[in-house]
Structure formats: structure tokens, C-alpha cells
Amino acid sequence: GEVKKRFGAPVFRPERELQVISRLQQANDGPLYGDNLAAIWREIMSASRALEKVMTVAYLGPAGTYSEQAAFAYFGQSVKGLPCPSLDEVFRAVEAGSADFGVVPVENSTEGVVSRTLDLLLQSPLTIGGEVALPIHHNLMSQSGTLDDVTRICSHAQSLAQCQHWLTAHFPQLKRQAVSSNAEAARLASAD
């Protein structure tokens, strides 16, 4: 940290952290798997960065979204998360300096690119600095514990599209409602 400060180097250097983790994984003879070792060192580096400066990372919120999960997977737990209600707000937060970085979905394996993110990247001076491949698992939840009582399905539009075949096969009669995030859908389901 002192050396970085003396030379005016940025606190977060993802390429350098990746080099260190890669070298540690190559030298690893066990008993930990490489992914476990990487996760441990990512948290050590995150905590070390926080001693220099606690970084704020904007993401598509609220808390509990895949974007939040991706943010902590990439930056570690020692950052301050800033949930934003829309992709536009994530970009605005970083552009205005309210956040040091932003995490937004760019693509997924079923629906392809997230067009709003690409539109914002074209309009913004911000650039992509890294990526996280995040396995996504969707769950259909009901407070009653049985699917017989489900009257509507709320989810983010992207998730509804990803699950459309399964939903059509199992619940063709139910109304589907797109909401701002899957976390918001869970909140709505818990209120029903």
C-alpha cells in the first residue's frame, strides 16, 4: 500500500491480483483446490485494499441480486456495496464518483447480450475492466411451501425469458409479471 501511494498507483490492480493468484495456483500442491485458494487470496487482497481505501461498488440492486453476488465475487467482501434500482443508475453512480466501480450484467447463455448494458456502454466514457462468469440458478418460491397455491409468477424479465420453456410446460395458465430484479420478486412473493 505504501509503495502504491508513493508512486500514485491505483489501489485496485486486477491484472496484478490475477497474476499473484495464478502463480499461487500453479505452485499449489494441495490439499486445497485451486478455486479455494483463489477465493481465500481474493479475500485477503480485498481486506488489504480496504486498509488503503474502502472501495464503493455499484450494482443492480437491491441486495441479494446476482449483480451483488458478482460484485463480491470479483472485488471480495471488503468493499461497500451500493445497490442501484436500474442499470442507468449504476452507470450514473460511477460517472458521478459516488462509486469507484460498477457491476452490470453484459450477457447470459440463454438470452444473449443484455442490450441496455451495451447501449449504456456506447453512451458512456466508462469501459469494461473485468468479468465474472456466474452460474445462475432460478427457484420458484411460495410462502405456502406448495406450488398449488401459486397464482402469479414474478421475476426479472431476463429470468422469465431464461425459464420460459419450463414455466410454459409446468404453469402455462399463470400470469407472469416482470419486476426490476429477482430480489424484488422474492420480496413481492413474501408479501403475498
Q: What residues fall within each predicted segment?
A:
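Domain-level signature for soluble enzymes in the chorismate/prephenate branch of the shikimate pathway
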Residues: 1-192
